[in-house]
A protein has these predicted regions:
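Long, non-catalytic architectural segments outside compact domain cores
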Residues: 1-32, 36, 40-43, 47, ...
Length: 60
């Protein structure tokens, strides 16, 4: 599992690369991981997506 600082860092990196569309991409990665039976990975992707949403809300 990633610590909170790493989750925020990765979320920020995805937002820089993909813009606000990163949230949808991150959620899609969570769905893919879950479909492949990897609940831990899916949880991590969802945490990163949630951090990306929080970052976007701070920018408003």
């Amino acid at each position: 599992m990633m610590d909170d600082a790493d989750v925020r860092r990765v979320a920020a990196e995805h937002l820089q690369r993909r813009g606000p569309g990163a949230v949808d991409w991150l959620l899609e990665q969570a769905k893919i991981a879950y479909a492949q039976g990897n609940a831990d990975s899916a949880h991590t992707w969802r945490e990163i997506a949630e951090a990306a949403v929080a970052i976007l809300q701070l920018e408003i």
